[in-house]
Amino acid sequence: MNKPLLSELIIDIGNTSIAFASFKDNKINLFVKMKTNLMLRHDEVFSFFKENFDFNVNQVFISSVVPILNGIFENVIFSFFKIKPLFISFDLNYDLTFNPYKSGKFLLGSDVFANLVAAIENYSFENVLVVDLGTACTIFAVSRQDGILGGLINSGPLINFNSLLDNAYLLKKFSISTPSNLLERTTSGSVNSGLFYQYKYLIEGVYRDIKKMYKKEFNLIIAGGNANLLLPLIEIEFIFNIHLTVEGIRILGNSIVF
């Protein structure tokens, strides 16, 4: 039996996890992750592909913020699919419906770049604030008219949580959860409150300030694997899209001008 043809595999190599998404008829029909490990071997990645990707692809597009793993994935993909993947980055030329770098190119992570492109290309918004809560918390603004406006980068919730546990002698490991109240009475509850309310106020504060700064309305899109516990606290209308980054990588991969 011939394997069904799925034309595109998108890979997002992040600091904490590596996301894989296959697209068929412009829709994601498979989304899986593996933990990022700087010591990953060729045979481990090949076994993961064999277990999860029993299909053919025409193209593989990759965004990577862990360059040490790029060679392994390039070799495995060639061994498995017999094709060479395309790595997207901010400094390539793309045929998009808007100019991301209207005021000139500047260094930007490929994952952040993908988020911002997807926010404009996949939605009918003119101005968007994009929040990605992963290993890092990135908050960037983008405009269809003016391109990428800039942003903020902070450590993500789990980084802050683990740093606190590592440096506070009496704090013991416990599960994080969405706080029930702003003011909690137990140590674990207070840590949860402090952890998530700081991001609530950061996101809502930046959102209010950029509206004043640019005198324009902005839509809010939230992405990232660590966002789900924060979402109930956000009091601004938003769209949550867990697949925003892979959607952006796919758009960029198909828009590269050679």
Curated annotation (Swiss-Prot):
Cofactor comment text: A monovalent cation. Ammonium or potassium.
Protein source organism: Borreliella afzelii (strain PKo)
Reaction(s) the record says it catalyses: (R)-pantothenate + ATP = (R)-4'-phosphopantothenate + ADP + H(+)
NCBIfam families linked: baf, PRK13326.1
Binding site for substrate: 94, 109-112, 187
UniProt xrefs under Gene3D superfamilies: 3.30.420.40
Similarity-based family: Belongs to the type III pantothenate kinase family.
Gene Ontology molecular-function annotations: ATP binding; metal ion binding; pantothenate kinase activity
Record-listed E.C. numbers: 2.7.1.33
Classification via CDD domains: ASKHA_NBD_PanK-III
GO biological process: coenzyme A biosynthetic process
Cofactor(s) the protein requires to work: NH4(+); K(+)
Functional pathway: Cofactor biosynthesis; coenzyme A biosynthesis; CoA from (R)-pantothenate: step 1/5
Primary localization class, coarse: cytoplasm
Primary role: Catalyzes the phosphorylation of pantothenate (Pan), the first step in CoA biosynthesis.
Source lineage: Bacteria, Pseudomonadati, Spirochaetota, Spirochaetia, Spirochaetales
Oligomeric form and interacting partners: Homodimer.
Top-tier EC class: transferase
Compartments (UniProt record): Cytoplasm
Stored Pfam families: Pan_kinase
Keyword Cytoplasm in annotation: yes
Residue sites binding ATP per the record: 12-19, 135
Keywords noted in UniProt: ATP-binding, Coenzyme A biosynthesis, Cytoplasm, Kinase, Metal-binding, Nucleotide-binding, Potassium, Transferase
Gene: coaX
One term under GO cellular component: cytoplasm
Binding-site list for K(+): 132
Designated name of the protein: Type III pantothenate kinase
Annotated InterPro entries: ATPase_NBD (IPR043129), Type_III_PanK (IPR004619)
Superkingdom of origin organism: Bacteria
